[in-house]
């Protein structure tokens, strides 16, 4: 196809609509024919990209491609002023991958054989040996300090051409495991490989991360550390094709044991009796991250935002307009214009500072699952997988 004709067709496709059917929700979307999909770059959706390159694009094809656009980038709809490389398309998961992704000649991580019940309890740290936060308490600050939330992880994917990128987040929970969302593991394009986890990061544009204090002295973190992933363990009942994204939780087992430091530490799991069946109404929770999703990123520097939790009934009523159901295994927070999970990562943590035996520690109350697009819409809280509901599953799937 001649390049001029190709871009003419692309222009016609994207000029035809100002609102798209395929709304992105943290990378999850619905195609015009009601299949589940992932909002990714047009070039990475093989069958739609091939369709666009065809010299015989029918009117029906054109309408389907228009309706497939899920192109929000930094809160802007991609219409008249767009860069081709930024065009986002809702690519059907059924067309991107088989039931299990095929990684070419790369060895596939295997599923864990279910250990003896609650075999991992002793492997998971308890307060005060987790959830320690060394950052300065800056109320209302958007950016974290260098040592805040040292359990935060960036998940690395290797794409065609050996191109690497971080498109999800996670949380370190012990020396070998990172907790994340199942959609970050199971609902990715078939030609992406989840290859690693980065720990000890703060500013993704520098290494090591340094700041200059008021006294003029330069203070630096230790360099970040990249760990290969040995095994990926999505929840077995995660239905990737469901609007409700139930059981959206996964574990990543790292190949090597993580060495703790002031910059790399685990977060606490919500094991306190007071945290049982609790969505923490009236309590402040914190979402943190770089704003990384499967299709976009917000910041090089780790961000944070303080949110209020939202009653499940109220959240359910809101998402019923999108034919979604929020269950007791999920929780909702945010809905404040311009804040919400725009500062969090897909798969990243929703954090609660709690107290036990005189100790103040951070606990992971939720895992970022989905929310409105663009993020931070007034009255639309983000939906999180409620971690306490999955403690048995976590404990049964970690091993030494």
UniProtKB/Swiss-Prot annotation:
Q: Which Pfam families match?
A: CLIP (PF12032), Trypsin (PF00089)
Residues linked to a glycan: 142, 296
Keyword terms: Calcium, Disulfide bond, Glycoprotein, Hydrolase, Metal-binding, Protease, Serine protease, Signal, Zymogen
Give the disulfide map: 29-90, 39-70, 45-91, 130-268, 168-184, 210-220, 315-332, 342-375
Q: Name one GO biological process term.
A: response to fungus
Q: What is its EC number?
A: 3.4.21.-
Location of the region described as Disordered in the Swiss-Prot/TrEMBL record: 98-120
Q: Which residues form the Clip domain?
A: 28-91
Residues bound to Ca(2+) are 201, 203, 206, 209
Top-level class of the enzyme under EC nomenclature = hydrolase
- Record's keyword annotation contains Signal: yes
This chain's protein is named: Melanization protease 1
What species is this protein from?
Drosophila melanogaster (Fruit fly)
Classification lineage: Eukaryota, Metazoa, Ecdysozoa, Arthropoda, Hexapoda
Q: Which gene encodes it?
A: MP1
